[in-house]
Amino acid sequence: MAETGEEETASAEASGFSDLSDSELVEFLDLEEAKESAVSLSKPGPSAELPGKDDKPVSLQNWKGGLDVLSPMERFHLKYLYVTDLCTQNWCELQMVYGKELPGSLTPEKAAVLDTGASIHLAKELELHDLVTVPIATKEDAWAVKFLNILAMIPALQSEGRVREFPVFGEVEGIFLVGVIDELHYTSKGELELAELKTRRRPVLPLPAQKKKDYFQVSLYKYIFDAMVQGKVTPASLIHHTKLCLDKPLGPSVLRHARQGGVSVKSLGDLMELVFLSLTLSDLPAIDTLKLEYIHQETATILGTEIVAFEEKEVKSKVQHYVAYWMGHRDPQGVDVEEAWKCRTCDYVDICEWRRGSGVLSSSWEPKAKKFK
């Protein structure tokens, strides 16, 4: 049975969207851009019935059945995932799946959260440095900007400075993950601390279920960052998963931005080699402390701060479970009965197969026989 406090606040919190960090905002905007540019497989609208042959409606069940031959990574044309993809699975995996299969417009409430998050994000950035807009034309340009940001931040971290929006990437349990760390700085004890700022619409701390998602997020950031500075992330893995063309010339805006930063390169391959060499020789430490800070959006009042204990085995176990879905090794799962309060404000509550089956997926989601290499 769900706790009374959770039920009372479900209307405001059950979407899992009531708080947003700068890093999540950046990843969310990247995801929205990817959705707009990606080629879809007859992507359906927000209704439970889809146009079929002769414009006759096809049920969501039959539409899904036709896609089961593909893994979710193949079905959604994904080369890699964002950390926030796995964090959304931590809240409700089925909600995440419906969000990708039945994309729709943001509700006014969620749009307002994004607008506020964008404003706070901008203010935090301007505290450290001026913002520079670099026009990009290709995915190679986009990755080049990530690499240039890393090259600019490494010296700051070496001198025990503070940086924001540190890009992280690496292969975890067979899936390539990309993310953005909100902030890295050193404590008075000289320890490297990851700080994740969460802005809250309401002046209350999040529910335990939301905190669990936040704990997983910062732990996963640490796991990937540590692998990067310890030389465990390789250029071969990056190229294999992202399918980047290393010999492709970078755009003039990117090259100009690189020169202004004292970096002379012509292609992404040159820049990537420089980044991996810099990470290897930087002697940056692993992250020592994980901190979550919750503040009220309207008043900027600090609601609470939490230090998160990093449990590597638990992180890897969760990632393995979530990755199994993306690889097509298992079906998506909804929430446990104890957390059914999350469904109250879910956009897909009326078509959710998990709810219809009382926690058991209907026939449209039953596992299909697949051959694994």
Curated annotation (Swiss-Prot):
Location in the cell: Nucleus; Cytoplasm, Cytosol
Q: Name one GO cellular component term.
A: nucleus
- Its Gene Ontology molecular function terms? 4 iron, 4 sulfur cluster binding; DNA binding; metal ion binding; single-stranded DNA 5'-3' DNA exonuclease activity
Q: Record's InterPro entries?
A: EXOV, PDDEXK-like_dom_sf
- Give the EC number(s) listed in the UniProt record: 3.1.-.-
Q: Where is this region: Disordered?
A: 37-56
Q: Does the keyword Hydrolase apply?
A: yes
* Biological processes per GO annotation: interstrand cross-link repair
Top-rank lineage group of the source organism: Eukaryota
Q: What class of enzyme is it?
A: hydrolase
Q: Which UniProt keywords apply?
A: 4Fe-4S, Cytoplasm, DNA damage, DNA repair, DNA-binding, Exonuclease, Hydrolase, Iron, Iron-sulfur, Magnesium, Metal-binding, Nuclease, Nucleus
- Classification via Pfam families: Exo5
The answer to whether keyword DNA-binding applies is yes
Quaternary data: Monomer; monomeric form has weak exonuclease activity. Homodimer; homodimeric form is unsure but has much higher exonuclease activity, suggesting that it could homodimerize upon DNA-binding. Interacts with the replication protein A (RPA) complex.
Function, as annotated = Single-stranded DNA (ssDNA) bidirectional exonuclease involved in DNA repair. Probably involved in DNA repair following ultraviolet (UV) irradiation and interstrand cross-links (ICLs) damage. Has both 5'-3' and 3'-5' exonuclease activities with a strong preference for 5'-ends. Acts as a sliding exonuclease that loads at ssDNA ends and then slides along the ssDNA prior to cutting; however the sliding and the 3'-5' exonuclease activities are abolished upon binding to the replication protein A (RPA) complex that enforces 5'-directionality activity.
Name assigned to this protein: Exonuclease V
Q: What's the source species' lineage?
A: Eukaryota, Metazoa, Chordata, Craniata, Vertebrata
The gene designation is Exo5
